[in-house]
Each structure stands twice: as C-alpha cells, then as structure tokens.
Amino acid sequence: MDYDRVVVMTLNMDEGTDFKEISGLQTPDQFPAAVTAIYHNILATKPDERAAAMARVIAEKHPDLVALHEASMLRTGPLNAPHPPSASKVEMNLISSLLRELEKLGAPYDLMYISGPAQSVIESTRTNLDAEAPSTCGFNVRITDRDAIIARTDNDDIQLTALEVHDFSDVQTITNPAVSIVIPGGWIQVVKWTPDFGPAA
C-alpha cells in the first residue's frame, strides 16, 4: 500500500437542531415546551438514516481519518432530575450509529485512544455541550454535542503517536429571559505516524 499521504475527511453530522426553539423565549415557563420541540425535531431528522448515508460516503472514499462535527447524543431520563446531567436512555448516538453502519459496509472505523497520565485514557472525542432540561413529555431531555475523530482499524501501518483535546478561550452563549446556556468550543488534535514518511498531523 502507498503511504505517501494520509487521507483525511471532515464531516458535519448535524445534531438535528440549531436551538432556534429557545432563542425567542420570554419566560421560564415556556422553556419545557421548547425542549419538547427540540426533542421531536431532532428525532424527525431520522438520525439513523442520516448516519447510514454518511457511512456510505465514508466507505466509498475510505479516508484514513474522519473528523466529525456535531456528533451528538440525545438521551432521556427522569423528570426534574438534579444537576449534573444524568439522563441515560439513549434516543440518538450519531457516533455509534455511524460506526455500526460502517461495520456493515465492511469499512471498519473506531474512535482513537491513547494512554494519559496516571493510567488514564484519552479518547478522540470532545464535548462542547452537555445540557439536560425538563420537557412537557414527562421526562428530562439531555443533549450532548460532541466532536470526534475516527480512524480506520484495518491499517496497522499508520499509528497514533499523539492525541490532544483543547478548549477555546471564548465561549458561545444563548441568553434570553427564559434561559442562559454556555457552549464552550474547542478542537481535537492527533498525530498519525507513517513508517516511511514520518508524522502527519
């Protein structure tokens, strides 16, 4: 195989909402109905079908690395559960759906891992937002907005040598009379080593 290059793809998975449902709220009492609308709107985008379509594109191009944006999770849990977010019933997991569909297509990919300090493990994902709120459906809704990098698992000749996850100093905020949400941004950096040509970031 020719290792004179590392092929990289970037893909926005689209979590299914831009949170416009909450942008114009005027009172806190309106918030649960907006959460319900976000929940139903996300599911209406047919996340599993979208993940399958993205998997077909990746399988066709077969890049070594794929950077995923808005690779989000949607979960539900007991109504009015206390902070921090704890809802665990998975309604959508775009990364898991994508990896499952890629496996079906014979194009195995996975998240990357590297050993961190004190026997910890660093994963090639980064959480931008992990928020949970009550809905009018009788349960809490939790949205976890993530970025991730996945890599081919059928190529042992390209090895991971470094993986770093960083935060931006500035944050995005959604603020109105009903709610204030802080969305920190950041990035994931990896270095893959190709035996004949050295590191490729």
Roles of regions detected by a PLM:
Residues 44-56, 174-193:
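A Trp-anchored, charged/polar loop motif used as the substrate-binding/catalytic surface
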Residues 130-132, 162-176:
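Short Pro/Gly-enriched beta-strand edge/turn motifs at strand-loop
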Residues 109-117, 160-169:
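Conserved S-adenosyl-L-methionine
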Residues 85-89, 138-141, 179-182:
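Short consensus segments that form the blades of beta-propeller domains
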Residues 4-9, 94, 143-146, 184-189:
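Residues that flank catalytic or metal-binding motifs in active/ligand-binding sites
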Residues 199-201:
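Flexible, glycine-rich surface segments
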Residues 1-130, 134:
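N-terminal, active-site-proximal structural segment of metallo-dependent hydrolase catalytic domains
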Residues 100-105, 138-163, 193-196:
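Conserved beta strand-loop-helix elements of the APE1-like EEP
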